[in-house]
Amino acid sequence: MAKKVQAYVKLQVAAGMANPSPPVGPALGQQGVNIMEFCKAFNAKTESLEKGLPTPVVITVYSDRSFTFVTKTPPAAVLLKKAAGIKSGSGKPNKDKVGKVSRAQVREIAETKAADMTGADIEAMTRSIEGTARSMGLVVED
């Protein structure tokens, strides 16, 4: 018989840097999960990613307090900021442009995010990432 699902916990944790402090500790502690066990497993799974990159994770907690988790790709905004070499997006994206990204970089980000996005094809996903870039105050160049 399958285990009964108690809760789904969605978090954004820095790759390779999960520790029992907030937000991880309180979110998992409420569900009765062994926090250190999660931290060790998460850090081992995200070893290949750049350390400190915010990584969304969905943790499925079962009624016997065991858990499984699935890591997603980092948010498009984070990948765009990294590609453009900026700290943050623009507060007024229509007026103040803070950086530039090439279409090739946008396409590369779309291909990275393809596993998590529900776009019809790579072109649609690329357009979606371009929209995110524009809303952050980035200029998309050919």
Curated annotation (Swiss-Prot):
Keyword tags: Methylation, Ribonucleoprotein, Ribosomal protein, RNA-binding, rRNA-binding
Which Gene Ontology BP terms does the record give? translation
| A GO MF label | structural constituent of ribosome
Which InterPro entries would you find in this protein's record? Ribosomal_uL11 (IPR000911), Ribosomal_uL11_bac-typ (IPR006519), Ribosomal_uL11_C (IPR020783), Ribosomal_uL11_C_sf (IPR036769), Ribosomal_uL11_CS (IPR020785), Ribosomal_uL11_N (IPR020784), Ribosomal_uL11_N_sf (IPR036796)
Recorded hits in SMART domains, A to Z, give: RL11
Q: Which domain of life is it from?
A: Bacteria
Looking at the keywords, is rRNA-binding present?
A: yes
* One family name in Pfam for this protein: Ribosomal_L11_N
Q: Post-translation: what modifications?
A: One or more lysine residues are methylated.
GO CC, any one term: cytosolic large ribosomal subunit
- UniProt keyword Transferase, yes or no: no
Protein family (similarity comment): Belongs to the universal ribosomal protein uL11 family.
Q: Oligomeric state and partners?
A: Part of the ribosomal stalk of the 50S ribosomal subunit. Interacts with L10 and the large rRNA to form the base of the stalk. L10 forms an elongated spine to which L12 dimers bind in a sequential fashion forming a multimeric L10(L12)X complex.
Function field: Forms part of the ribosomal stalk which helps the ribosome interact with GTP-bound translation factors.
Q: Which NCBIfam families match?
A: L11_bact (TIGR01632)
UniProt name for this protein: Large ribosomal subunit protein uL11
- Specify the species: Erwinia tasmaniensis (strain DSM 17950 / CFBP 7177 / CIP 109463 / NCPPB 4357 / Et1/99)
Lineage here is: Bacteria, Pseudomonadati, Pseudomonadota, Gammaproteobacteria, Enterobacterales
